[in-house]
């Protein structure tokens, strides 16, 4: 005859089993993701950094997420956000006009070059920098703020102690291995991007503007977006530089799920290496599987 004590013990074990199996399943899934990212990196011949934040519960998927990578044009998000922050106390700021001279043009200016000998508003410069990765637009934003160090100072004001912007376009894209200039880590960037787009780092109007710019990006179709279901909404900012450096940072709205924040950074040992957007797409597919 089963004693009351034994019955209680069996009930305790039975109640615990689902938790144990659930924990074991999650652990196995995490190991599988890490192994897949490691295999992807090995096949690429480069160095891959990934940070995903699931805002439903703030769980994370991390791979080399505390290592420094050159940001390249993903740093444009911070510069644009810094200008948006200023506009919180000056409602006319984004309409301020900035002169565009031929001597301002650098190596990639798809929007600014159309305004030579004219002007662009700070809002237009923000859109050009984030949606078309216009380098002259980025330099104008940096100049307005007072230099690269002011962009870094804005990051510090958000609690980001890792981000550092040292130069302007196009030299910030040299991405020399081991060079700490113009770098951050995947995790630091993911946390800051989350704060800027989904948190309280910006006021509601400015936050909505930043998200609108990111959703309207024209340069990311072959990167993170390519690894996600077509029905998901994505706002992202790409970046690329020497050493085959290929980056993309994104806020993702899956169907019937809280937003995800994903940072993918990739670089290679050879200075003239080709960009590998396919690696970013593959990484995105791996870490978002199951959402």
Curated annotation (Swiss-Prot):
Pfam families named in the record? Beta-lactamase2 (PF13354)
* PANTHER family found in the cross-reference section: BETA-LACTAMASE, BETA-LACTAMASE-TYPE TRANSPEPTIDASE FOLD CONTAINING PROTEIN
User: Which E.C. number(s) belong to this protein?
Assistant: 3.5.2.6
The GO molecular function terms of this record are:
beta-lactamase activity
Miscellaneous notes: The class A beta-lactamase family has a specific amino-acid numbering system, sometimes called Ambler or ABL numbering and often misspelt as Amber. A multiple sequence alignment was used to derive a consensus sequence and then the consensus was numbered taking into account insertions and deletions. This allows use of identical numbers, e.g. for active site residues, despite differences in protein length. UniProt always uses natural numbering of residues, hence there appear to be differences in numbering between this entry and some papers.
Assembly with partners or alone: Monomer.
Annotated catalysed reactions: a beta-lactam + H2O = a substituted beta-amino acid
GO BP field: beta-lactam antibiotic catabolic process; response to antibiotic
Please provide the record's keywords in A-Z order.
Antibiotic resistance, Hydrolase, Plasmid, Signal
Please state the span of the N-terminal signal peptide per the UniProt entry. 1-29
Family designation: Belongs to the class-A beta-lactamase family.
Write down the superkingdom of origin. Bacteria
Q: Does the keyword GTP-binding apply?
A: no
- What is the recorded name of this protein? Beta-lactamase Toho-1
Q: Which residues form the active site?
A: 73 (acyl-ester intermediate)
Q: Where does substrate bind?
A: 237-239
As for what it does, the entry says: Has strong cefotaxime-hydrolyzing activity.
